[in-house]
């Protein structure tokens, strides 16, 4: 069994993976750049001098990013890209051979009891969070295999390692992204193409509310009341507010530009705690009991 110290070193601390030169002046395409982690990552990379291709479904929603880029004279190019539209993906990535890094950040979260998620909503969750990244990956891989270089950074979540209640649909999408990324890591390595996962814990940004969808009948239900109690219990992890989301952007940036970055990158103390506890527990029942005790959560 992987002990917690080894787990932390391997999954979290990229400095222990061996020194390697940081790559500069990259052309980096990011999906979902109009808000949240995508917005922060776009600005962070551009401020470091990389050419950022910031993509989103609706360019009108990228006004804040465009204004900052213009004010600071940042190397940011805006493109329309809807990961759920194959034609849009093909058009946005037609110049894949000139792109060095692909960051799959676009996504949304379905919150609600699993039995309340209908087929249409579940299909939308998987199409955006799983099939969408697969579409962008398919668009770049042929050219990258020919030139023998490239890097893919998939933004996942701690719930892609261990599911949490009242978010089963979202967890399912992130579990799928994790499995897809593990397979791609091994498939792409012979052609010198890097693959990385970013696994944030709980983070708060003012722009994330619009990326959450709840099923019909959820608001005011008994299951919603239980979810509220669970989220309140999460504050017992450290007794503090969620950390600065810039730390997630920094982890994405590091994976994009540092060839020595690890495959998995947990971000946040709660992410480390949950993943470590899950890996260390002899059984799932032991993990569940331990989490209930740690959170003082008994509903």
Q: Can you name each region flagged by the protein language model?
A:
Residues 162, 183-194:
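Active-site-adjacent segment of SDR/Rossmann-fold oxidoreductases
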Residues 34-35:
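Conserved glycine-rich cofactor-binding loop
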Residues 190-262:
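SDR active-site lid
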Residues 137, 173:
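Active-site helix of classical SDR
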Residues 113-114, 121-123:
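Substrate-binding pocket helix/loop in short-chain dehydrogenase/reductase
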């Amino acid at each position: 069994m992987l002990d917690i110290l080894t787990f932390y070193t391997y999954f979290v601390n990229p400095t222990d993976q061996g020194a390697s030169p940081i790559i500069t002046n990259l052309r980096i395409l990011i999906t979902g750049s109009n808000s949240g982690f995508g917005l922060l990552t776009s600005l962070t990379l551009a401020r470091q001098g990389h050419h950022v291709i910031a993509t989103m479904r609706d360019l009108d929603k990228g006004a804040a990013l465009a204004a900052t880029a213009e004010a600071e004279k940042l190397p940011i190019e805006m493109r329309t890209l809807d990961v759920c539209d194959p034609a849009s993906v093909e058009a946005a990535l037609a110049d894949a051979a000139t792109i060095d890094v692909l960051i799959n950040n676009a996504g949304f979260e379905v919150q609600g009891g699993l039995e309340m998620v209908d087929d249409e909503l579940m299909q939308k969750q998987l199409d955006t969070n799983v099939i969408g990244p697969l579409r962008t990956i398919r668009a770049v891989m042929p050219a990258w295999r020919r030139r023998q270089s490239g890097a893919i950074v998939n933004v996942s979540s701690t719930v892609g390692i261990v599911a949490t209640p009242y978010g089963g649909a979202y967890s399912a999408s992130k579990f799928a992204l994790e499995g897809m990324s593990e397979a791609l890591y091994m498939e792409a390595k012979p052609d010198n193409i890097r693959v990385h996962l970013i696994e944030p814990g709980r983070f708060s940004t003012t722009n994330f509310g619009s990326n959450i969808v709840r099923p019909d009948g959820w608001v005011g239900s008994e299951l919603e009341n239980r979810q509220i109690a669970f989220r309140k219990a999460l504050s017992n992890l450290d007794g503090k507010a969620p950390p600065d989301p810039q730390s997630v952007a920094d982890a994405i940036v590091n994976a994009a530009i540092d060839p020595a970055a690890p495959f998995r990158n947990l971000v946040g103390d709660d992410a480390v705690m949950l993943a470590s506890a899950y890996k260390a527990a002899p059984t799932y029942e032991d993990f569940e009991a331990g989490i209930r005790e740690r959170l003082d959560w008994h509903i």
